[in-house]
């Protein structure tokens, strides 16, 4: 960087430095013209640029300049395609350059704790590994164009209900393994210019003033060297926030918090060094944006629309396909049923709402793809304005379906059902849509349901339809992408990035979402999504990682290059995948790891690798994965680090979390010995489970139990069970004078210091 930032900071007044730490207006940073510090613009959003027009009111979020509306993250994640996500990110970066936007507010890497979260359509997955990998690709793509990405919302912002005030209570291990992990790899791997803190409190402190979150973890551990920005209006106490690591407040405070910062520095409440560090981080990004600015930048709208079409097609998930009803034949009569045909839901509502450069017409795209030999019949079926059942529309739909070879029913969630700002209260689609599907099933056996929704829904009619294609919110090229997949021009290759439960009550957060008053406790802990369903043995409607194809794939020959390794070693895993069908296609190979026996609670299995591979009919390829320590580790709160327990681990290769086709066993040996610290209140059983400690306590315990004639080897002896469960201090009373309190203290000290 040609600019000497430290020199500039020395030339800045205290007031200028404080002023740089809050916005100029809703979207810009403050300039300092006398020192050559420009103002830069940041704006939404994750799946398309939402730059509000200059004449638009702040609340008029739908009045923005035209931009390409790509599939939302919920859909794009189902592509499991790092390269595709990076290409979408690069396209977003190009559009930012064309509109003089320096920072794009996205991607969102929040975990899908509950299917009810109203903003889930903006997030990638329930799994932190998948989420962080795709977020990293998105960031790399955006920043490849000289535009900064803003990773958000850090952290534990997993609901819209009271999101600005709710206190999210999460234990440390769950934070590390689930909610932090979704951000960690993205920060370390892709180095986003900006990270946005969330609105909520985390374990009692607002994220905007949480030092542990913003400084200790994000900046010191993960080495984030950009700046931290508040979510819009998330600042509670500006001085405390700055001290904790919140560099930039957005939007403008109209000078109010600038004065508070100045007063805090003058009074000694806030160190000027902390202010200087925040200014340095902000200036670094501002000048990076300035250096990378492309004058008179333009982008190819048609090329971006084609990319949006490809991204949507590659993200669609074929959930069910009995009798190979899909792909559709390019002949005969096809009934297209549902108001979504004419007025599709292709994006979510809220701050990510895009004004598209163009919008495909689903009916026209299917008509064009089908050709002259296809006769299309359209029937509205239901009204989008309300959920009321219109029998006249249903009868018209039945008539259209009965006279057709196949009926394609478009269903899903209207805008009013899911949006930023509020959560759903159920997983149902509108009752008029459910009734329509049931009615069509009475007269037509070949039914395809196309779902347009941002998160999982219940499907009470699932056994009455032959095919279900999950299209999520597919962006402006949804129509063309649907035509490609329905007619087989594109072989569906998407797989679910989240579990579809049979019903809401099966979800692990069911009893604790959205919490009570201003507090929500994550009592399910680590067991989010498939980690819960698979461990609990609950059969989902469609499991995590599930997705069908128009072709068939076979797996064989799993191998590992090492079977017995230390935890700091690298293990390479390879597996062969062959296309044994008649159509070219892509398969997503998933690798899970299972700890066979652990002293701590762990999920049944966890995703630790995935690769998407293209195969022509008859073609076979070898897919290779590399596993390091983190693939086998859990977060140990005693040592405040990732730890692997010595033992056997299973490496599982699957088509989904529930369809495991190959497995191999490896032994991983820990290089870190963790010694528990015992006290007089430690249970006898816990001490005896440690071999070194047992060698010290064992003889003393045997002397006491022999005198009491207690058989400690008899698992059904009540007194033996009591002895095992009692604290060491209770042995004094049972010892009949053999063990004093002073002797016990010496014994505990010896136990803790034994080699």
Swiss-Prot record:
Family: Belongs to the glycosyl hydrolase 3 family.
EC class (word): hydrolase
Active site residues per record: 231
Enzyme Commission number(s) of this protein: 3.2.1.21
GO BP terms, alphabetized: cellulose catabolic process
Pathway: Glycan metabolism; cellulose degradation
Gene that this polypeptide is encoded by: bglB
Keyword field contains Hydrolase: yes
InterPro entries: Cellulose_deg_GH3, Fn3-like, Glyco_hydro_3_AS, Glyco_hydro_3_C, Glyco_hydro_3_C_sf, Glyco_hydro_3_N, Glyco_hydro_3_N_sf, Glycoside_hydrolase_SF
UniProt catalytic activity: Hydrolysis of terminal, non-reducing beta-D-glucosyl residues with release of beta-D-glucose
Species in which this protein is naturally found: Acetivibrio thermocellus (strain ATCC 27405 / DSM 1237 / JCM 9322 / NBRC 103400 / NCIMB 10682 / NRRL B-4536 / VPI 7372) (Clostridium thermocellum)
GO molecular function, one term: beta-glucosidase activity
Descriptive protein name: Thermostable beta-glucosidase B
Keywords annotated in UniProt: Carbohydrate metabolism, Cellulose degradation, Glycosidase, Hydrolase, Polysaccharide degradation
């Amino acid at each position: 960087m040609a600019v000497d930032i430290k020199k500039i900071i020395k030339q800045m007044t205290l007031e200028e430095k404080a002023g740089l730490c809050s916005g100029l207006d809703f979207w810009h940073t403050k300039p300092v013209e006398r020192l050559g510090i420009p103002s830069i613009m940041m704006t939404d959003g994750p799946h398309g640029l939402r730059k509000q027009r200059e004449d638009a009111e702040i609340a008029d979020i739908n009045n923005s300049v035209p931009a390409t509306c790509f599939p939302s993250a919920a859909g794009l994640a189902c592509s499991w395609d790092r390269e595709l996500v990076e290409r979408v990110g690069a396209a977003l970066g190009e559009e930012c350059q064309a509109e003089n936007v320096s920072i794009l507010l996205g991607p969102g890497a929040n975990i899908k704790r509950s299917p009810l979260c109203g903003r889930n359509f903006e997030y990638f997955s329930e799994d932190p590994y998948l989420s962080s990998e795709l977020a990293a690709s998105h960031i790399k793509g955006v920043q490849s164009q000289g535009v900064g990405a803003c990773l958000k919302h850090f952290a534990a912002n997993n609901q819209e209900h009271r999101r600005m005030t709710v206190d999210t209570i999460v234990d440390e291990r769950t934070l590390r393994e689930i909610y932090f992990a979704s951000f960690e790899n993205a920060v370390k791997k892709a180095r986003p210019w900006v990270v946005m803190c969330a609105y909520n409190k985390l374990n009692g402190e607002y994220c905007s003033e949480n030092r542990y979150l913003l400084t200790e973890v994000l900046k010191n551990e993960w080495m984030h060297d950009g700046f931290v920005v508040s979510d819009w209006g998330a600042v509670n106490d500006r001085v405390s926030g700055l001290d904790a690591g919140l560099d930039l407040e957005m939007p403008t405070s109209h000078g109010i918090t600038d004065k508070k910062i100045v007063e805090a520095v003058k009074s000694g409440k806030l160190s000027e060094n902390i202010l200087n560090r925040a200014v340095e981080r902000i200036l670094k990004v501002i000048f990076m944006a300035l250096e990378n600015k492309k004058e008179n930048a333009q982008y190819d709208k048609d090329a971006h629309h084609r990319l949006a079409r490809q991204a949507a097609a590659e993200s669609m998930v074929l959930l069910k396909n009995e009798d190979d009803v899909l792909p559709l034949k390019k002949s005969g009569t096809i009934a297209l049923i549902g108001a979504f045909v004419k007025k599709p839901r292709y994006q979510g509502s809220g701050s990510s709402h895009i004004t598209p450069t163009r919008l495909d017409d689903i009916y026209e795209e299917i008509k064009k793809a089908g050709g002259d030999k296809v006769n299309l019949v359209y029937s509205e079926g239901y009204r989008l304005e309300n959920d009321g059942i219109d029998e006249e529309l249903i009868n018209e739909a039945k008539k259209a379906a009965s006279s057709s070879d196949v009926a394609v029913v478009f269903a899903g969630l209207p805008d009013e059902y899911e949006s930023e700002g509020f959560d759903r209260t159920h997983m149902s689609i509108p009752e008029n849509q459910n009734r329509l599907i049931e009615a069509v099933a009475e007269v037509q056996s070949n039914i395809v349901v196309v779902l347009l929704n941002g998160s999982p829904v219940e499907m009470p009619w699932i056994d009455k339809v032959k095919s279900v294609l999950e299209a999520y919110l597919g962006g402006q090229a949804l129509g063309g992408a649907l035509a490609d997949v329905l007619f087989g021009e594109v072989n569906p290759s998407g797989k679910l990035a989240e579990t579809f439960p049979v019903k809401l009550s099966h979800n692990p957060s069911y009893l604790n979402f959205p919490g009570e008053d201003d507090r929500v406790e994550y009592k399910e802990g680590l067991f989010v999504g498939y980690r819960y369903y698979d461990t609990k043995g609950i059969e989902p409607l469609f499991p995590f990682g599930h997705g069908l194809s128009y072709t068939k794939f076979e797996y064989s020959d799993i191998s590992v290059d090492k079977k017995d390794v230390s935890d700091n070693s690298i293990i390479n895993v390879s597996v062969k995948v062959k296309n044994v069908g008649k159509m070219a296609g892509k398969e997503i190979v998933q690798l899970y790891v299972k700890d066979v026996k652990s002293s701590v609670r762990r999920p049944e299995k966890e995703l630790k690798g995935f690769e998407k591979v293209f195969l022509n009919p008859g073609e076979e390829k070898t897919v290779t994965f590399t596993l390091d320590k983190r693939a086998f580790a859990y977060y140990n709160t005693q040592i405040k680090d990732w730890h692997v327990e010595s033992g056997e681990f299973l490496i599982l290769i699957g088509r989904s979390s529930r369809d495991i086709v190959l497995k191999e066993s490896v032994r991983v040996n820990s290089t870190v010995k963790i010694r528990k610290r015992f006290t007089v209140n430690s249970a006898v059983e816990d001490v005896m489970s440690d071999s070194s400690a047992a060698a010290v306590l064992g003889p003393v315990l045997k002397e006491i139990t022999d005198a009491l004639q207690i058989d400690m080897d008899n698992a059904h002896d009540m007194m033996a069970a009591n002895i095992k469960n009692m604290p060491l201090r209770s042995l004094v009373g049972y010892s009949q004078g053999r063990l004093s309190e002073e002797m016990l203290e010496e014994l505990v000290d010896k136990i803790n210091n034994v080699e």
